[in-house]
Amino acid sequence: MELLRTITYQPAASTKMCEQALGKGCGADSKKKRPPQPPEESQPPQSQAQVPPAAAHHHHHHSHSGPEISRIIVDPTTGKRYCRGKVLGKGGFAKCYEMTDLTNNKVYAAKIIPHSRVAKPHQREKIDKEIELHRILHHKHVVQFYHYFEDKENIYILLEYCSRRSMAHILKARKVLTEPEVRYYLRQIVSGLKYLHEQEILHRDLKLGNFFINEAMELKVGDFGLAARLEPLEHRRRTICGTPNYLSPEVLNKQGHGCESDIWALGCVMYTMLLGRPPFETTNLKETYRCIREARYTMPSSLLAPAKHLIASMLSKNPEDRPSLDDIIRHDFFLQGFTPDRLSSSCCHTVPDFHLSSPAKNFFKKAAAALFGGKKDKARYIDTHNRVSKEDEDIYKLRHDLKKTSITQQPSKHRTDEELQPPTTTVARSGTPAVENKQQIGDAIRMIVRGTLGSCSSSSECLEDSTMGSVADTVARVLRGCLENMPEADCIPKEQLSTSFQWVTKWVDYSNKYGFGYQLSDHTVGVLFNNGAHMSLLPDKKTVHYYAELGQCSVFPATDAPEQFISQVTVLKYFSHYMEENLMDGGDLPSVTDIRRPRLYLLQWLKSDKALMMLFNDGTFQVNFYHDHTKIIICSQNEEYLLTYINEDRISTTFRLTTLLMSGCSLELKNRMEYALNMLLQRCN
């Protein structure tokens, strides 16, 4: 067997700093504790890379005894001086140290390899190959390679510094992680790994100790000591390499290492994060390998069904049966659960609390009391993690319909998760609530509109205390309150309002490459990009609005975009041209622009097998049903929620939601409202 890796990480023991070697501090302000320096604008995000050495033998370790590495290190080529700090980790060939550039105080993780450790040609080749592969990589979720140099004693590789060490350290402190945390970390691992595979590079040693966490709790894939170029099947190396517990059956059977082998290791990583131990851990290596070859492991009942299914698919014995990285992100495990936009550093040692309070939430509790007071015994709910009765399956099978979601959710500093539980939906019930109660519900609906949406004069003002989650929450509460309390009726009410509002007339899903594009009824074209940013081309085709976060808008001419936005503006124009040339409008609503209302931009979208859901910054909510081209649009105007229904003949009718609450509506419309609510709850969750 060749090269079975084991890396041992040292606790970051306190070491005496550079002052001893220099007689003074490393930087201008030596008395202060020096935090990691923020990166320059042009550089990738700064983070840690206590990257272990190129390779370590499994059966024996060489001693690291040898000449003490100097505290001050000089690059012979450039003359730059560095100060060596504490040990971050060690392995068979090298140790990894914190190292500071004395010219600018920038901190690196430096892998220092004594020439004596790589004296044999094949050992030196491994180091050279690692440098060659790693130095060309540039990705947010891959440890950044900065520089390497040699002196008479050592080889020095300078890498991105990650102050919060590795996932192995976090799991050691935490024992197990919550599902939202696992989704948070896995999304980033998949992002980095997808980039590597697109560069035709296999990592071949994915494990918790090789996922590094920076100051901002961002994950970076590191340690390319065993990485290799992807070869055609017939030319693949038959080397057995990697961490014993994470080796795949095909690697153990010497059939070669492909992308599927990295997916297998990812399955082991997910299992370990959730349960605190690897899936194939046994008392001896021989038994471990037998279990791996047979893909035999236990799946505790404590795991929820989506997590079990995703792990089982990644740990399929046959490599061809494993999901692709895109399949993984579209799996129910990600679609049906909350994923935080960021994690607090306290998550390194403490279980996070995702039940955060916010001004919007406190308001909802008061405003929605009338919607939910004393109703729970009268309404039935469906728990989508449990069995659903047969008569409801056709309407409420959304959980199984969901094949594809939008992109990762748009960053939001205030995003909260109200309830970590499966989404629920309402089933129609008989009985008519008292008139006073309906009036109370109508008042509550108006109160929520007035309190959150009706008084806004700009999108930034609308969302100052609000978030993507609370926009969805508001619409869901209002729609659910209406559905729970309106009477049964055979037809749509007579009311027909003449109103003006924006809605989506055309859309294009190009999320496999760029993002989701749409055209509004005023001919504004918008794209929600795969990175969560949003860009709009106004009807004049000359002005671009760019939203990096909720409520934060940059405006610039389409013909003179800032350099960093040029490629996105090109994509935006492509979407605009495509929809103009190839798609027809989806209904008969007049195109009216109200300059007093904030500009619409898309917050979220979701596709199931039956429908497309879109949620906008001002609370406008649209669901398009594929099979009959019917549409539901909910928006707020003048402290009132309005619902527009576009039927199969593309004829639209608009009602006040309070009218539907009092009069009821046809089963045709009610079923669509319930399905729309189910999609919204699914996305909220």
UniProtKB/Swiss-Prot annotation:
InterPro entries assigned: Kinase-like_dom_sf (IPR011009), PLK2_STKc (IPR042825), POLO_box_1 (IPR033701), POLO_box_2 (IPR033695), POLO_box_dom (IPR000959), POLO_box_dom_sf (IPR036947), Prot_kinase_dom (IPR000719), Protein_kinase_ATP_BS (IPR017441)
Pfam family for this entry, one: Pkinase
Region ranges (Disordered): 24-71, 406-433
UniProt PTM comment: Catalytic activity is enhanced by phosphorylation of Thr-239.
Example GO biological process: negative regulation of cellular senescence
Binding annotation for ATP: L88, G89, K90, G91, G92, F93, A94, K95, C96, K111
Keyword set includes Cell membrane: no
Keyword Glycoprotein: no
Activity regulation: Activated by phosphorylation of Thr-239. Once activated, activity is stimulated by binding target proteins.
Family matches, as SUPFAM superfamilies: Polo-box domain, Protein kinase-like (PK-like)
Domain Protein kinase: 82-334
EC code: 2.7.11.21
Assigned protein family: Belongs to the protein kinase superfamily. Ser/Thr protein kinase family. CDC5/Polo subfamily.
Swiss-Prot/TrEMBL domain comment: The POLO box domains act as phosphopeptide-binding module that recognizes and binds serine-[phosphothreonine/phosphoserine]-(proline/X) motifs. PLK2 recognizes and binds docking proteins that are already phosphorylated on these motifs, and then phosphorylates them.
Job description of the protein: Tumor suppressor serine/threonine-protein kinase involved in synaptic plasticity, centriole duplication and G1/S phase transition. Polo-like kinases act by binding and phosphorylating proteins that are already phosphorylated on a specific motif recognized by the POLO box domains. Phosphorylates CPAP, NPM1, RAPGEF2, RASGRF1, SNCA, SIPA1L1 and SYNGAP1.
Name of the protein in its database record: Serine/threonine-protein kinase PLK2
Organism: Pongo abelii
